[in-house]
């Protein structure tokens, strides 16, 4: 997970880490997603029920194409919080098979103004 910091640069943020994004600035991320499971992940266009999305605070970011086991994609310029933050705010990233289940690890970052 990389988040654009207050200086406008991409900053790698580890699970449980923090980043200063600037007060009121949109929180924008670049997410590298790897399928470590047994089955291929399908995009919503191929599987409206069960297609895979990354979720963050109620927002959903669908994967753009099929990801085979051990495959990887990068979701560029994902706006996690359009209105930014005014105080330290945790953001939890998860995976969801649309309409079926939330799965995989929880990845949490704290965004500060």
Q: Can you describe what each PLM-predicted range is?
A:
Residues 13, 23-30, 74, 87-91:
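Short, solvent-exposed loop/turn segments enriched in Ser/Thr/Gly
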Residues 38-54:
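Short, hydrophobic/aromatic beta-strand segments
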Residues 1-22:
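Low-complexity, acidic Ser/Thr/Pro/Gly-rich terminal tails and inter-domain linkers that flank the onset
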Residues 33-37:
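Asparagine-centered strand-capping/turn motif at beta-strand->loop junctions
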Residues 58-84:
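Intrinsically disordered, low-complexity Pro/Gly/Ser/Thr-rich segments with frequent PxxP/GP/PP motifs
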Residues 82-111:
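Terminal connector regions
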Residues 17-26, 67-69:
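Short, solvent-exposed beta-strand/turn "edge" segments of beta-rich domains on protein surfaces
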Residues 10-12, 50-64:
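Short beta-strand and strand-turn-strand segments in soluble, beta-rich domains
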């Amino acid at each position: 997970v990389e988040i654009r910091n207050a200086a406008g640069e991409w900053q790698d943020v580890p699970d449980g880490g923090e980043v200063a994004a600037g007060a009121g600035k949109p929180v924008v991320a670049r997410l590298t997603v790897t399928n470590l499971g047994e089955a291929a992940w399908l995009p919503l266009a191929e599987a409206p029920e069960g297609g895979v999305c990354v979720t963050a605070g109620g927002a959903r970011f669908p994967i753009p194409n099929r990801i085979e086991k051990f495959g990887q994609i990068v979701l560029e310029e994902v706006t996690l919080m359009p209105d930014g933050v005014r105080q330290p705010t945790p953001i939890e990233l998860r995976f969801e098979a649309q309409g079926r289940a939330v799965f995989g690890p929880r990845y949490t970052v704290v965004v500060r103004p």
